[in-house]
Amino acid sequence: MTLCKSEQMLFALLKASLHQQEVETECLHQASVDDWKQCYLLACKQGVMALAWDGVMKLPQELQPSKGLKLTWAMAVEAYEKKYARYCQTVAELSEFYQKQGIATVQLKGVGLSTYYPNPSHREGGDIDIFTFSADKNKMSDGEANKLADELMVKQGIEVDMHSPKHSNFFYKGIPIENHKTFLNVERFPIAVQVESILKKVINPQHTALLNGEYQILTPSACFNTLFLAFHSAQHYGSGLALHHLCDWAMLVSKYGIQIPKELTDRRFLEAISALTCLCNRYLGTSYVIPGGELLADEMLEEILHPKYLQRGIAVKGKINIFVYKTKRFLYMSRINNRILYLPMWKRVWESIVIHVRKPDTIFRVEQK
């Protein structure tokens, strides 16, 4: 696909930021005030605002955006750096608390993955995903440890949502936490069962330092992250896949390559891995040779930058129009997601019916941007 000016600018900034190199400035010459504004807004939307800022700081003065935009950008970056430090402290404190109770805690994605980046505090994230298990199998099982982790929060007066078979949800010191029982939606996708069993074998937790050694946490192996990130991105295809996910993949590939266990043979999933890698090679400065995925890569990028259907801010009014829009969106998202993670259409429809029966107010609700 052909990139517009602001998209070209953003990719140039990200490539320089991720690989600590000079910015390719061809697309930045004669960039207007509006081009820079659109570049900044796109970076914010795609969850790469702080990463793009590192690229801006590599530019000569005459190619940088206006002082007003730089001030806005710098303030947003500073705010995120403070958020990142708070997340690092929180996950380290939570891990230490659990450790005293005989529970080991592995950080999934998030601040653990940020250590793959040249500037970890500029890798943006949302909630904290953890996997809790027994630190000593002679004293309690992994399942007992995972259950105890939730019970300990309840004892502190923290409300824990345990409705999901995949993970529980709670807020710890104001930060959303997902405590995983399983890594993937094994009850939903057939391929998830196979990948889940592999993930359990290759997790190999290792100690990882955060904030220049101020905190220590456990993180999974590169092989684990290869499969986990690919599956996570695949789930978001059609419903929120962003450059944020692509940058994670680029950093993984740059640091460790792609580690795919030989027992993983699902054609759709392997094509998704190829497509993600193809996009990183084209736009984010990686050079990992992998066959296939070109066509899917094109479709992925189109969906990332110009999604056909919005998840928020639906531009229609009236119950009939909203229902038609959401139905078309559901069918479209199901079709493209099925290219990577197969799920029978009857099951997707049934899941949607169950959700809306439980929460009928969501049928005609228009989510805000």
Can you name each region flagged by the protein language model?
Residues 1-126, 132-369:
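Conserved NTP-donor binding/palm subdomain of two-metal-ion nucleotidyltransferases/polymerases, i.e.
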